[in-house]
C-alpha cells in the first residue's frame, strides 16, 4: 500500500491540476536528503532531477534500511506512476480536492496488475483506453463503481460462470512490490456485471469453492468483490480491514462496507464484519473469527458439504 503522493505531484493549470509522475533519481535524492521536521509533508525539490515526494513517505520505498517498500528504481514504478497520472488527468481535480486525492492509500500490487493487463495484447484493457482509465480510477478510489471482471486487477482465471470470475493472484511474479513468501496463494472473485445474480450462478460458485477450495475462507474487504484466502491468513486480513475501516471513518471517507452474499462468505467473517459495522472494538470483532458458529440451514437443496477424503481438493496444502 502507498499514498498517491508517492507516485506523482500536482501542477496547477488554470482552475484544475495536472499530475506529473516522479522519476527515480528525484526520489533517490529525497531519500538521502536532510529535511526539517516542519517540511516533512511538503513535496521535495531535488534541484537537479525535479520534484520528489514528501519525505514523510520515505518508508514507502525500498532502501538498504527498509526492504518492505516499493522497488522504485524498476521500470514498473514508472509505468504505474504514468498510468495513475493518465487517469487523474482524465478528470478534473480542483484545489479543494487535491490534498484528499493525494493522501489516498492505494494497492500497489493492484496497480501493477493493471499495467500487466494493459500490456497484454490479448486483454480487453490493451484495446480500450476508456475501460483502462475506468479500471485505474476504481483502483485509486476515484470512482464509486465496484471492480467488475472487465475492470478487475487481473491474474490467472481459474473459474468462470455467467455471473462470477475467479482469479488466482500473481503477486509472486511482481517487480514493484512482490510477495516474498513462496507459499502465498490467494484468489479474488469479481462480479461479471454489477447487477442481481441468479441463485443457480451462486450455487455453481459455492459448489466450486466447496469442492476445490475447501482449505480456504471466502472473505470480503467490503469493496464489492470476494477474496479466497488461507485460513491461517484470516486474522491478518481482519487487522487490515478493521484498520482501513476505522481510518476511513476518521478521515471522513465513509464508503459503505459491502458485506456481499451471506451464502458465499465464510460465516465467521460475515459475523466479524457485521460486528465491525456496528462499532465494536477489534478484540470483540476478532473473537467471532475463532468462535464455533451454529451451522445454518443449507441454502441450496442438494448441495452437500460432506465429501469423502479422496474427493476433496488438496489445493493449498
Swiss-Prot record:
UniProt-listed GO biological process terms: viral genome replication
Entry-linked InterPro entries: Rota_NS35_C (IPR048306), Rota_NS35_N (IPR048573), Rotavirus_NSP2 (IPR003668), Rotavirus_NSP2_C (IPR024076), Rotavirus_NSP2_N (IPR024068)
Binding site for ATP: 107-109, 188, 221-223, 227
GO cellular component, one term: host cell cytoplasm
EC number from the UniProt entry: 3.6.4.-
Cofactor dependence: Mg(2+)
Class of the enzyme per the UniProt entry, highest EC level: hydrolase
Record region (RNA-binding): 205-241
GO MF, any single term: nucleoside diphosphate kinase activity
HAMAP family, A to Z: ROTA_NSP2
Family classification: Belongs to the rotavirus NSP2 family.
Protein name (database record): Non-structural protein 2
Gene source species: Rotavirus A (strain RVA/Human/United States/P/1974/G3P1A[8]) (RV-A)
Amino acid at each position: 500500500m502507498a499514498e498517491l503522493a508517492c507516485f506523482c505531484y500536482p501542477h496547477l493549470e488554470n482552475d484544475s491540476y495536472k499530475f506529473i509522475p516522479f522519476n527515480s533519481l528525484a526520489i533517490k535524492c529525497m531519500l538521502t536528503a536532510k529535511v526539517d521536521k516542519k517540511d516533512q509533508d511538503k513535496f521535495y525539490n531535488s534541484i537537479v532531477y525535479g520534484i520528489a515526494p514528501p519525505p514523510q513517505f520515505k518508508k514507502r520505498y525500498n532502501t538498504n534500511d527498509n526492504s518492505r517498500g516499493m522497488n522504485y528504481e524498476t521500470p514498473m514504478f514508472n509505468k504505474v506512476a504514468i498510468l495513475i497520472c493518465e487517469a487523474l488527468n482524465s478528470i478534473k481535480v480542483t484545489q479543494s480536492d487535491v490534498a484528499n486525492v493525494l493522501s489516498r492509500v492505494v494497492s500497489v500490487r493492484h496497480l501493477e496488475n493493471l499495467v500487466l493487463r494493459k500490456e497484454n495484447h490479448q486483454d480487453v484493457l490493451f484495446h480500450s483506453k476508456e475501460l483502462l482509465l475506468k479500471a485505474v480510477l476504481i483502483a485509486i478510489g476515484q470512482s464509486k463503481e465496484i471492480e467488475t471482471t472487465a475492470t478487475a486487477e487481473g491474474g490467472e482465471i481459474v473459474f468462470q460462470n455467467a455471473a462470477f470470475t475467479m482469479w488466482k493472484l500473481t503477486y509472486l511474479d511482481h517487480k514493484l512490490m512482490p510477495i516474498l513468501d513462496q507459499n502465498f496463494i490467494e484468489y479474488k472473485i469479481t462480479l461479471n456485471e454489477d447487477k442481481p445474480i441468479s441463485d443457480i450462478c451462486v450455487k455453481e460458485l459455492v459448489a466450486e469453492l466447496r469442492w476445490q477450495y475447501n482449505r480456504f475462507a471466502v472473505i470480503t474487504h467490503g469493496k464489492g468483490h470476494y477474496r479466497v484466502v488461507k485460513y491461517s491468513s484470516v486474522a491478518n486480513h481482519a487487522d487490515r480491514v478493521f484498520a482501513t475501516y476505522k481510518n476511513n471513518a476518521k478521515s471522513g471517507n465513509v464508503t459503505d462496507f459491502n458485506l456481499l452474499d451471506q451464502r458465499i462468505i465464510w460465516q465467521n467473517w460475515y459475523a466479524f464484519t457485521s460486528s465491525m459495522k456496528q462499532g465494536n472494538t477489534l478484540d470483540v470483532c476478532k473473537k467471532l473469527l475463532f468462535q464455533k458458529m451454529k451451522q445454518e440451514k443449507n441454502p441450496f437443496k442438494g448441495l452437500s458439504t460432506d465429501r469423502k477424503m479422496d474427493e476433496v481438493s488438496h489445493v493449498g496444502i
